[in-house]
Design a protein with these regions (language model features):
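Active-site C-terminal subdomain of aminotransferase-like
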Residues: 22-104, 118
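A short linear hydrophobic-aromatic micro-motif
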Residues: 112-116, 148-154
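Conserved PLP-binding catalytic core of the aspartate aminotransferase-like
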Residues: 113-143
């Protein structure tokens, strides 16, 4: 898990191990959350170095080496914020509503935007699409950068017949935010 950690309710009992690069939803860059069943920890190969065994950290209360104090502090602040928002169910509802707004635009664009995921398989966290032509995509990326939209236009999936470029967009703080948003 990464983009979707704490974005929706997940029954952790369904997994032996959850490894979440959680810097998008839970804390600063580099934060990793690991949730492991004790039965899974016991399956580590003996020849693994100590630092590569999850059991090393579990058996030492995650304090085998110096903990990243600031990252832990920020995760704690984020968890409190999520609780204040109404918990994970409220966060999931909010995420679904925001994603629906974007998917509705894609679905009702008469082919201007082309979504990739089947409706039942869509992510509320990573919305992928293309525009009708590669030229339109280049223009979209250029104009998006001016509006503080971070566009990963270089993501390419290899299909059996030909590569399929996928656009993924995320808002990021603008360097010139005052000038960009002064009319709002």
């Amino acid at each position: 898990m990464s983009s979707d950690i704490l974005s929706r309710k997940v029954n952790v009992k369904d997994f032996d191990l959850i490894y979440a690069g959680a810097q998008k939803n839970l804390g600063p860059a580099g934060v990793v959350i690991v949730i492991a069943k004790k039965s899974f920890l016991a399956t580590a190969r003996e020849e693994l170095p100590t630092m590569l065994k999850y059991s090393t950290f579990a058996n030492n209360d995650s304090l085998y080496n110096t903990p990243p104090v600031f990252a832990i502090y920020m995760v704690n602040k984020t968890l409190h914020w999520i609780k204040k928002q109404g918990g994970i169910n409220a966060i999931a509802k909010n995420n679904a509503a925001k994603a629906k707004l974007i998917y509705d635009v894609i679905d009702n664009s008469n082919g201007f935007y082309k979504g990739h995921a089947a409706p039942e398989a869509r992510s509320n966290m990573n919305i992928t699409f293309n525009l009708a032509t590669p030229e339109m995509e280049k223009d979209f990326v250029a104009k998006g950068k001016l509006q503080a939209l971070s566009v990963s236009a270089v993501i390419v999936l290899s299909a059996a017949a030909a590569p399929v470029p996928i656009m993924q967009c995320r808002w990021r703080p603008a360097r010139r935010w005052r000038s960009l948003w002064k009319n709002i």
